[in-house]
Every structure is written in C-alpha cells, then in structure tokens.
Amino acid sequence: MSIELHKIYKRKKSDRDIFQELMPFKIKEILLIANYYDAYTIEREGQFTDKIVGEYLQVNLYTAPRFTSVASEAEALKILSERHIDLIILMAGLDKQTPLVISRHLKDLYPNICQLMLVNNNSDLAYFHTIEDRLYESIERLFVWNGSTKIFLVMAKYIEDKMNLDRDTHLGDIRVILLVENSIRYYSRYLPLLYTEVMTQTQELIFSEPQDNDMSIVMKIRVRPKVILATNYEEAVYVIDHYRENLIGVISDVRYKRNGEEDEEAGIELIRYVKRTGAYIPCMLQSQEIENAVKAEELHAAFINKNSPTLAHDIQDFIKGYLGFGDFIFRNKNGEPIDRATSIEEFKQKLLSIPDESTTPFATVFLPG
C-alpha cells in the first residue's frame, strides 16, 4: 500500500515541487582563514562583503553566503564550535606552511566540511605542485586568486554542483557541462567565465518565456546546468559514463594525466571516447598549441586557443551555439540554415510550416547560425 501511495505522490509532483527540492546542499556559511597580510590582498580594493554580494546579484542570485574571516587556527576552532559552517577556504600566500597545518588539523576534527585553498598568485603554484600528495589529503581543490571576487562565487558553486550532482540529475533531469582541465591557473580562469555565461544564458531563457505566478524566477534558476570539473582522464570518463544522458557539452584540455601518466593526447582520446558512446554531445578542445586545431576538426569538435584575447567571447559562442542556449536553427539535409526560432512558442509555430527534412535529428541539432 505504501509503495502505491509513493507512486501516486511521484506522479502528481508538480514542477514547483521538483524545483523546490533541487540544490538541497547550499553553501550559506563560509569560514575564511587568512593571515592579515593575505586578507589584505583581497580587501585592499574595496569592501570584500559588498563585492561578494555584488557578484551574486550580477547573476540574479539574491542570497550570498555569509563570510566569517579569522586569522588563526584558534579563532577558526572557536567559530566552528559555535555555528554550522558549510565551506572552509584557506588562503596561502607568503606563509604556505601554516595553512596546510591548520587544514590537516581541521580535517581530523571536521572531516565532513569541504576545504578549498586559494593561493595569492600563479607563482605560488609551483610550490604546491611539489606537495600534491600531502595537499589533497585535506584540501578538496586548489584555486588561484585572479584579482576578482568572482572566484569566491565560483568556489561556492563548484562545491554545490559537486554535492548536488547525483540528486539533481535524477530528480530534475538537470543538464551537465564537463570541464576537463588540470591546470589550476586555467581552471581558475575558465570556471568564472563558464559560470557567468551559463547563469546569464539560463536567465535569458527564463525571461524570454511567459512567467507564471506559481514559480519564482529564483526557483527556476536552480535548473541551470551543473558545471563539473575533472582534472584527469579517469575522472572525466566517470562523469561521462554516469551522467551521459544529462551531458550537454564537454570542454577539454589536450594534455593531462591518463592512467597516472602525463598524456599529450589525453584530450583527443577523451573526445574519441565521447564519440564512441553514440550520443550527440558537443565537444570543444582548448589548447595553447594551435596545431591541435586540426585534430579538433578531424574529431568534429570546436577549438579555442587558451591564450586567445577573445577567450571569453569564444566560450560564449560555444555555449550559445552548441549547448542549446542560442536560437534554434532549422537546417535542410545539407546542413544549411533555412529558419530559426528564438523561443519555445516560436519553435512550435515554425514546426507547422517548415519542411519535414528539417525536423530530423540531424537537421535540428543546435549549431551556430
């Protein structure tokens, strides 16, 4: 009897119910551990909290997490004993040893709280590469300060997406974008671009459709695609295998670890792996080596130069053109555009008049118009 009632409940669950249950893990409280000098590097250009709130409001996220800043392990332990903390961020600058010691101590005492580390600049990364094994015993991921407080929004969203991925894809059929990049410097640069563009495009889709009173815009924004970061071949394959039905795009570097060894063609092999699944998943290779553009073309994948001055625009073009955020382009059997729809309503109307050949799966793939 209870099984039947459960089935009835599931069948009658409305969109609003599903939206409300998405993103059950939200980062509301962040503990920032930084000595006074390191804290100064991020606060010297203005009010830190105001800037964080501004970053959230810029992408229509109306509730920013609260930051509590401390300068020592003793202060951190006091805060942790007094209130619930969702995420710990440790800054490492001139003093690189103390944050590591604090991190290990906190991991022993609070193993379920995610810890991320933020280094002051790219030159500090060389040191952390030499101690990777010890570093990742307590630190989930390393990021590099790029001069913008947007990196804090990205760090919070990175953890939220990772924690909510399994539940949200099963409950709400949420889409997934996979970024494969092992360079801390580059993923610290890419992720802010990706999150900003995904959130902006999601909002444009929401605002382009008639709004109902039963569902707030804030709630609908929860259906934005998850952005998942992998740093080696095996991590990427795991995401592809487990979330293939939800995957709408793969952006991959060319060189990273495969089978534990640096592989100069790991990204090439990954795109081939995606193609072998038989699913239509748009792929983009990104590399500093321009000659890899030829390999990308052979794989029918897009390509961008990692050092391009138009990097942000190139990523925007890929997301709008290939991941379903841009206009829907109707094409004939030769792939030539014959019409376009800018909204769901317009799409429905155009379906009544376009040739049958333009409604085949081949002809209705999202491509740049």
Spans of features found by a protein language model:
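Conserved phosphotransfer microenvironments
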Residues: 6, 10-12, 41-44, 48-53, ...
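Structural motif
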Residues: 33-37, 90-94, 118-121, 146-147, ...
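Amphipathic alpha-helical segments that form the core helices of the histone-fold
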Residues: 364-369
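Non-catalytic signal-transmission and effector/linker regions of two-component phosphorelay proteins
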Residues: 1-68, 132-226, 233-234, 246, ...
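Alpha4 helix (beta4-alpha4-beta5 surface) of REC/receiver domains from two-component response regulators
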Residues: 96-101, 105, 117-143, 149-153, ...
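Hydrophobic beta-strand segments of well-ordered beta-sheets in folded domains
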Residues: 27-33, 85-90, 113-118, 139-142, ...
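Residue-level signal for alpha-helical context at structural boundaries
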Residues: 94, 124, 173, 208, ...
